[in-house]
């Protein structure tokens, strides 16, 4: 009997300790592992994005079969549910297409071996100093049997991959300078030469990861908890803090102050939305009343192209790449320069002469079957995606605005649509929005939360993520057009 009583007392004491250490909301234990000498990492950020408060992230209910299927597919393909996926899920139709395309590029049958694919992803992401993507693909590269020595620097990779460095550099920062000579140098490099099919696969991977770096910075994607910069071993500052508090809105004081400060300008941002709606209505009326001549539209394109040179942010300083990223590429000083620099003449790229639908799509599909169709589907979803809403307004036709954003990006790259009136861009896109667009597309490593917050202040975060989807797909298409045109010229 005494043994039974002692056992009951020990059990009761154990329950009392567990009660003290457990969280009443999630049932988890606090501190027990630390007492056992185990260092437990804690996430540094609150949720998958530094720009979007976690309480405003899309919550997936247990009844949402489509979302759960997407998450399951992502986890099965990548072995993880990364923060990019958790932000893109605002737009499930796009996310499904994105995951399908990325899975095909990285894991399905194709011209390049698996470890080459991940290494090219590392090279592309490193050009924009995107340590988030570099870290993810370093893990994937090693997982598929890649040689760890290659990760010590590009000079330790095979000469064939080193030769790709020049194309990676120009494609990432000044794609309009790509010529058929770049292509010829890769295809005729003796024992280190690329086949046409391999090169198309590499080009698609490079453009995919240049653009994904833009999304990563543009949405302020936080590092995964297991990656550098994603965790800390310091104890929380509040003794009764639990990890479940993150999902309950227990954010830092600074974040709450930022949110309250943002509310002060609600009335101003409300009028911005109304003004944009009115401009769209007026432009639609003008379209119906009169149409500009071809000469006038060509003149407006040149004017917009020149004006885009003077769009830059006050934070437009050089960003020195960290050693752990810069070792994956050469010529670290090479970066973006405006298409229309003084003393430098580059002919305008006319979509009428070479376009994705009539030329690029068929070339990619011929040399890398099925990929052209996947990319084309992704372009169309991003371009046509709409919920017919603008901030608090419903039943709005946003096609005019989406086209202005897409064509402005292509204009910055010197790409012109003969049937588009570029005068609409200045009417629809204000300076703060142009600064954000140009930074995300051309120098994404310089994007700040202030830039993200300063444009379309009354719009929902899901709408800003939608903008970023437009930006990255327009950028990817622009890069592909220049690279594929050079390949076509080499072939003919």
From Swiss-Prot:
Pfam families given in the database record: PA26
Catalytic activity, as annotated: a hydroperoxide + L-cysteinyl-[protein] = S-hydroxy-L-cysteinyl-[protein] + an alcohol
Effect of deleting the gene: Triple knockout mice lacking Sesn1, Sesn2 and Sesn3 do not display an embryonic lethal phenotype since they are born at an expected Mendelian ratio. Moreover, they are not distinguishable from their wild-type littermates. However, their survival at 10 days is dramatically affected. This is associated with a constitutive activation of TORC1 signaling in the liver, heart and skeletal muscle during postnatal fasting, that occurs between birth and suckling.
GO CC annotation terms, alphabetical: cytoplasm; fibrillar center; GATOR2 complex; nucleoplasm; nucleus
EC number(s) per entry: 1.11.1.-
Organ and tissue specificity: Highly expressed in heart and also detected in liver and skeletal muscles (at protein level).
Region feature C-terminal domain, mapped onto this chain: 321-492
Residues at the active site: 130
One annotated GO biological process: negative regulation of cell growth
Region (N-terminal domain): 71-252
List of residues that carry Phosphoserine: 293, 314
Binding-site positions, L-leucine: 386-389, 398, 463
Subunit details: Interacts with the GATOR2 complex which is composed of MIOS, SEC13, SEH1L, WDR24 and WDR59; the interaction is negatively regulated by leucine. Interacts with RRAGA, RRAGB, RRAGC and RRAGD; may function as a guanine nucleotide dissociation inhibitor for RRAGs and regulate them. Interacts with KEAP1, RBX1 and SQSTM1; in the SQSTM1-dependent autophagic degradation of KEAP1. May interact with PRDX1.
Family assignment from sequence similarity: Belongs to the sestrin family.
Name this polypeptide is given: Sestrin-1
Organism of provenance: Mus musculus (Mouse)
């Amino acid at each position: 009997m005494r043994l039974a009583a002692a056992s009951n007392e020990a059990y009761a004491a154990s329950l009392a300790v567990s009660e003290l250490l457990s969280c009443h909301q999630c049932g988890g234990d606090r501190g027990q592992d630390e007492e056992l000498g185990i260092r437990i990492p804690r996430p540094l950020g609150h949720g998958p994005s530094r720009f979007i408060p976690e309480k405003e992230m899309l919550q997936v209910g247990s009844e949402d079969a489509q979302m759960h299927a997407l998450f399951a597919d992502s986890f099965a393909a990548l072995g993880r549910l990364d923060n990019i996926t958790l932000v893109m899920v605002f737009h499930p139709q796009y996310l499904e297409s994105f995951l399908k395309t990325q899975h095909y590029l990285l894991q399905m049958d194709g011209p390049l071996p698996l470890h080459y694919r991940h290494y090219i992803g590392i090279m592309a992401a490193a050009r924009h100093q995107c340590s988030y993507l570099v870290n993810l693909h370093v893990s994937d590269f090693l997982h598929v049997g890649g040689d760890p020595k290659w990760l010590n620097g590009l000079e330790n990779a095979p000469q064939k991959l080193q030769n790709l460095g020049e194309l990676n550099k120009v494609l990432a920062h000044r794609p309009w300078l790509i010529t058929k000579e770049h292509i010829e140098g890769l295809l005729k490099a003796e024992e280190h030469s690329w086949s046409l099919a391999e090169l198309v696969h590499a080009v698609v991977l490079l453009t995919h990861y240049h653009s994904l770096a833009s999304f990563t910075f543009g949405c302020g994607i936080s590092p995964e908890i297991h990656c550098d910069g994603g965790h800390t071993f310091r104890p929380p500052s509040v003794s009764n803090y639990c990890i479940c508090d993150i999902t309950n809105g227990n954010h830092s004081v600074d974040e709450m102050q930022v949110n309250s400060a943002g509310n002060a300008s609600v009335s101003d941002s409300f009028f911005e939305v109304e003004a944009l709606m009115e401009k769209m209505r007026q432009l639609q009326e003008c379209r119906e009343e009169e149409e500009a001549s071809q000469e006038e539209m060509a003149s407006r394109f040149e004017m917009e192209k020149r004006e885009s040179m003077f769009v830059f942010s006050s934070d437009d300083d050089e960003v020195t790449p960290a050693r752990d990223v810069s070792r994956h590429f050469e010529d670290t000083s090479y970066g973006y320069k405006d298409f229309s620099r003084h003393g430098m003449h580059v002919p305008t790229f006319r979509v009428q002469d070479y376009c994705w639908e009539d030329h690029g799509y068929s070339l990619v599909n011929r040399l890398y079957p099925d990929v052209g169709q996947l990319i084309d589907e992704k372009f169309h979803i991003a371009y046509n995606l709409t919920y017919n809403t603008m901030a608090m307004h419903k039943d709005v036709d946003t096609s005019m605005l989406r086209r202005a954003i897409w064509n402005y990006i292509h204009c910055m790259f010197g790409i012109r649509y003969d049937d588009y009136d570029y005068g609409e861009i200045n009417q629809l896109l204000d300076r703060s929005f142009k600064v954000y667009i140009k930074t995300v597309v051309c120098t994404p490593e310089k994007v700040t939360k202030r830039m993200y917050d300063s444009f379309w202040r009354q719009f929902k975060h899901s709408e800003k993520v939608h903008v970023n989807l437009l930006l990255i797909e327009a950028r990817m298409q622009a890069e592909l057009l220049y690279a594929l045109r050079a390949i076509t010229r080499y072939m003919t």
